[in-house]
Amino acid sequence: MKIILSVLTVLFLVSCSSTKIVDTWTNQEHLNYKPKKVLIVGVTENLTARRLFESKLKDEFTARGINAVESYNVFKPTFTNAKQTEEEIDEEVKRVSDNGFDSVLISAVKGVDEKVTYSGDAYRTNYYWRRFGRYYYLYQDVYFDRGYYEKYNVYHIEASLYNLKENNDKSLVWVASYDIVDPNTINTTINDYVNAIIKSLEKENIISNK
């Protein structure tokens, strides 16, 4: 939990796109774990984005009979606006746990990759030409067509669920990695990402379907 709360300085991107799950892992020691009161933490400097993400995820948990609260209603502004010491983080974790929270779900950006795609006529990729002349003849149009190269970003985002009552190396219940491609609009991205998280948790039987 110390590590989790200390990543509050990392930017959490919620802004539209295509959301794809990349990987997921569930702690085999928590196969029957069912969260009852969840603190939802969206790591971002953008307060609007944070509120939208946490509120949307809270609504999804509530619809499944799980008590959930947004971190902006729990954390003091001084906690998220400044870097915390380990002692201060421990105190906040204890305060949250003492208030009845048994779980925390936190999401943060782990990295960003810039990609390049070429837009133009389609070329055969399933055949190898054995003569240079034939190869060059067929592909020389790349010099003359109106295709272009376009850059876009892929954001690698991680969501993790922790058991606050453990508060040790075994407290991680579930973690999943997602890729969000070239986000544009905040509302659509948040909806897509939250839905992806919920589907993952349902698949692992951590939460029930509606």
Which positions does each model-derived feature cover?
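N-terminal segment of the mature soluble domain
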Residues: 45-114
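Surface-exposed short loop/turn segments
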Residues: 87-160
